[in-house]
Regions:
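BTB/POZ (also called T1 in voltage-gated K+ channels) oligomerization domain detector
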Residues: 1-92, 213-250
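Amphipathic alpha-helical interaction motifs in eukaryotic regulatory proteins
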Residues: 45, 52-56, 78-81, 85, ...
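Ankyrin-repeat interhelical turn detector
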Residues: 111-114, 148
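Acidic, serine/threonine- and proline-rich low-complexity regulatory tracts
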Residues: 3-6, 100-102, 106, 119-250
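Leucine-rich repeat
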Residues: 26, 96-97, 130-131
């Protein structure tokens, strides 16, 4: 969840918005927690069709006020601007679980604002982060599924298929927990947040492979799981007209 920013005032400047205080900027983005980012309208127009439309329709106001406490808080606005403007996000103080949750929220923000170029940069970053174990594989899988990116899901599977849960099941997205000793991609052992946040088409495609997933899997078995997931997902998407967010007719 977003960090506690109840002390924010119109004058608050901290590590999240300090980079975005250009005195020549003509737009102020006000995050849902009140933190303000001074940016140029041409930058918003260039990177988001939704912001472009908002700026065309707005009156003389120089503020865009964001209200969604989950995906429009200051930490997500900061990440979005970093990706859009070519800055390296500051991840030093972010733990693996919190960064995974933040990635899910950022992915939803990019979808809401149709930010195509930032989304592509984000996808490249996720490939790197999952490989370097900066973000855990199951978190990347969920984010990739929500962005309908099969190849990134497969990269997450390849990296983490042998990883096991160490805690008990939980529905809390902030508690990285599943049934101990089971693969993080065995959905019968997955925490409820993982099931809830993964689109149904991706859930079913992975579920069909769970009978193969277990301790001491050989590379041949792992490759079979990944190939099976790829085939099942393609078949399921044919049945939904390519829209993975739709329900599945069985």
């Amino acid at each position: 969840m977003p960090s506690d920013t109840s002390e924010n005032t119109p004058d608050t400047i901290n590590n999240l918005n300090r980079r975005y205080q250009d005195e020549d900027a003509d737009i102020i983005l006000v995050a849902s927690d009140g933190l303000r980012f001074r940016v140029h309208s041409y930058q918003l127009r260039a990177h988001s069709s939704v912001f472009r439309s908002m700026l065309e329709l707005c009156d003389s106001s120089h503020e865009i006020i964001l209200t969604d406490d989950d995906i429009e808080a200051s930490d997500i606005v900061c990440l979005y601007l970093d990706l859009s403007m070519g800055h390296e996000p500051d991840l030093e103080a972010t733990g693996m679980v919190q960064l995974g949750i933040r990635c899910r929220r950022l992915g939803d923000f990019l979808a809401k604002y149709d930010a195509a170029s930032a989304k592509q940069t984000f996808i490249y970053a996720l490939y790197r982060w999952v490989e370097l174990e900066i973000v855990s594989s199951e978190r990347v899988f969920v984010v990739a599924a929500r962005m309908d990116n099969r190849d990134l899901c497969i990269a997450a599977l390849k990296k983490g298929l042998s990883w096991e849960w160490k805690n008990v099941a939980s529905s809390d997205e902030e508690t990285q927990a599943g049934y101990a000793g089971h693969s993080i991609f065995d959905l019968s052992a997955a925490p409820l947040w993982m099931i809830k946040l993964t689109p149904p088409t991706y859930t079913l495609a992975l579920m069909r492979q769970c009978r193969k997933i277990g301790k001491g899997m050989s590379n041949e078995v792992k490759n079979g799981v990944i190939q099976g997931f790829r085939i099942e997902l393609d078949l399921l998407k044919e049945g939904t007209g390519g829209d993975s967010s739709k329900g599945i007719d069985i």
